[in-house]
């Protein structure tokens, strides 16, 4: 499939969640035509919303979604990618490209489909970006990095969206996605903890936002090791001990784990601080 050379390009979306709808909407904004949306059912709210946004028809069966489409986006939960894609085999056009959007799963999830239809291309495309809604996602996609796997057409598709594609080995996808989860989901959970601890101290959580933004900017400018500041980086065990004493047991446990990561990042050889951080939770 020649993604950038076709004047009439049609796509279908299977799995109208936030990521799938965002990617499909971005392509429609770039001249693609959406011809079909398949979800849990044609009447499901997510299916209706995606179809209305994309100007596409709602199909009852996944098996019918590929008809007339140059590109099929599979954005279902990971556990059903293989079977969902395989169901497309009877309707796919010769030369069509089928991509899934999973971060953790390799292109191999589409092997069953490719075995049945060797005349179509299959690949994986995972934008390394948080896409909480199509409206927000459309603003965030351009310039974001994107993990791709498959034929050159997958990379061309990513570039057409303004993404910055990179390739990773199939065996490294789970590790890659774990890194993305730590950087996004776990960071959000950590910031939620920081907000809760600040609130307990009578500090408005929004007061932390300039510090959070500055920390991310410092990592961008300097790298993690040089951006690290604070008591662990200074070897200030007395302050760390006061922090641990002030925190509830669950918060202290998280603090110890992350402080050990900070100590390793700092490169400090500080047995006393290590012993403090390895101590029993209160």
PLM-predicted stretches and their roles:
Residues 42-48, 106-109, 153-154:
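Short, charged/polar "capping" segments at the starts of alpha-helices
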Residues 21, 25-29, 52, 86-90, ...:
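Short, well-ordered alpha-helices that flank and scaffold nucleotide-derived cofactor binding pockets
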Residues 11-13, 74, 148:
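Hydrophobic Val/Ile/Leu positions in short beta-strands of Rossmann-like dinucleotide-binding domains
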Residues 217-275, 280-282:
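Interdomain hinge/lid region at the active-site interface
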Residues 1-61:
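NAD(P)+-binding Rossmann beta1-loop-alpha1 motif at the extreme N-terminus of oxidoreductases
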Residues 53-137:
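Rossmann-like NAD(P)(H) cofactor-binding subdomain of soluble oxidoreductases
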Residues 6, 49-53, 113-121, 134-221:
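Internal alpha-helical scaffold of NAD(P)-dependent oxidoreductase catalytic cores
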Residues 35-39, 98-100, 145-149, 262:
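Short, hydrophobic beta-strand segments that form beta-sheet elements in well-ordered domains
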């Amino acid at each position: 499939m020649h993604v950038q050379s076709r004047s009439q390009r049609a796509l279908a979306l299977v799995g109208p969640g936030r990521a799938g709808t965002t990617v499909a909407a971005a392509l429609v904004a770039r001249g693609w035509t959406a011809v079909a949306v398949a979800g849990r059912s044609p009447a499901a709210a997510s299916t209706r919303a995606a179809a209305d946004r994309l100007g596409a028809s709602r199909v009852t069966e996944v098996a019918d979604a590929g008809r007339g489409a140059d590109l099929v986006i599979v954005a279902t939960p990971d556990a059903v990618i293989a079977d969902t894609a395989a169901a497309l085999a009877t309707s796919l056009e010769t030369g069509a490209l089928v991509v899934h959007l999973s971060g953790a799963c390799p292109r191999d999830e589409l092997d069953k489909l490719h075995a049945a239809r060797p005349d179509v291309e299959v690949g994986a495309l995972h934008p390394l970006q948080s896409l909480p809604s199509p409206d927000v996602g459309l603003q965030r996609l351009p310039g974001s990095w994107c993990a791709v796997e498959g034929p050159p057409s997958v990379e061309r598709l990513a570039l057409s969206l303004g993404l910055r594609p990179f390739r990773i080995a199939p065996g490294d996808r789970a590790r890659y996605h774990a890194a993305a989860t730590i950087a996004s989901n776990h960071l959000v959970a950590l910031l939620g903890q920081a907000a809760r601890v600040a609130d307990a101290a009578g500090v408005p959580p929004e007061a932390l936002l300039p510090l959070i933004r500055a920390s991310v900017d410092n990592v961008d400018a300097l790298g993690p090791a040089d951006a690290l500041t604070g008591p662990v980086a200074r070897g200030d065990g007395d302050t760390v001990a006061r922090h641990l004493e002030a925190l509830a047991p669950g918060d202290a446990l998280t603090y110890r784990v992350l402080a050990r990561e900070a100590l390793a990042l700092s490169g400090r050889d500080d047995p006393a601080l290590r012993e403090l951080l390895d101590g029993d939770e209160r």
